[in-house]
Amino acid sequence: MSYNVTIEPTGEVIEVEDGQTILQAALRQGVWLPFACGHGTCATCKVQVVEGEVDIGEASPFALMDIERDERKVLACCAIPLSDLVIEADVDADPDFLGHPVEDYRGVVSALVDLSPTIKGLHIKLDRPMPFQAGQYVNLALPGIDGTRAFSLANPPSRNDEVELHVRLVEGGAATGFIHKQLKVGDAVELSGPYGQFFVRDSQAGDLIFIAGGSGLSSPQSMILDLLERGDTRRITLFQGARNRAELYNCELFEELAARHPNFSYVPALNQANDDPEWQGFKGFVHDAAKAHFDGRFGGQKAYLCGPPPMIDAAITTLMQGRLFERDIFMERFYTAADGAGESSRSALFKRI
């Protein structure tokens, strides 16, 4: 049994299979509704039911309050149709978004690389190429691990038959612990994707700033490789933050790219390097490196941020003080079920991010 869901104001119609959520069906049919967490805690995918009956699912009471339930609002990531539906969604069409449909893939681990003491590079050969846009992510399923985990793609879209993921070891994390300690080359895994709307806005003028911290380097790496492969002539500057030299990974890749491409600059920053006499680069936090590099003036540029929430919030503050605005700054924040829907899970400065 399946039901048709009409999405207003665009008028698009999707077919939702029995037991499938509205969001799952939409993404797999190339219809991109706003979403973030995917499990009912952040409220990004809230929509209005205009006609029809729906099971609201396991939506958090913080993300979907009682009064909103009475008003027939639902979270698309949890809601399962019980009849044909008409819903109203805040669909913000972006001319630069390619909207590749989400599909399921099988893969085999082709390489495991120690990028740093806490970050491992996971390479997976897929059963077929996966079209995606640089900056997007996949949901990875692992043997014996409940649920899926989201990891950004580090490879460029031109190499879409083998994906590269950067996995930071999280203390107590079942999935990251499994990847770091048990997963082996040749093991079979499954994944779905692509997900996410973190991508370079090619139609928008302005030079590009990338600020990355930790394993958050993955998306900027994919974006920068894609831009340079396509011959983009805008000035591109990557600021990569880490605690120390051991945690600063793939620096040789970006140094080599900077040597070959005059429009690309690479600025690494270490925030625990005061006792490292051999470190000749920037000493301090990565947002301060960006401020120093541009003398605190960022006007006319577009910024893409990826990393731990404290780094992102500090970078947003620095960029806005340097005359960038909400429309100039892009990021994607991953949520876990433990994050809840509190204000701390979003930027205190922007409504959009």
UniProtKB/Swiss-Prot annotation:
The protein depicted here goes by the name: Phenol 2-monooxygenase, reductase component DmpP
Oligomeric form and interacting partners:
The multicomponent enzyme phenol hydroxylase is formed by DmpL (P1 component), DmpM (P2 component), DmpN (P3 component), DmpO (P4 component) and DmpP (P5 component).
Which intervals hold domain 2Fe-2S ferredoxin-type?
3-93
Tell me how the cofactor is bound: Binds 1 FAD per subunit.
Which Pfam families did the record assign? FAD_binding_6, Fer2, NAD_binding_1
InterPro entries the UniProt entry points to:
2Fe-2S_ferredoxin-like_sf (IPR036010), 2Fe-2S_ferredoxin-type (IPR001041), 2Fe2S_fd_BS (IPR006058), Beta-grasp_dom_sf (IPR012675), Cbr1-like_FAD-bd_dom (IPR008333), FAD-bd_FR_type (IPR017927), FNR_nucleotide-bd (IPR039261), OxRdtase_FAD/NAD-bd (IPR001433)
* Top EC group: oxidoreductase
Q: Which cofactor does it need?
A: FAD; [2Fe-2S] cluster
What metabolic or biological pathway is this protein involved in? Aromatic compound metabolism; phenol degradation
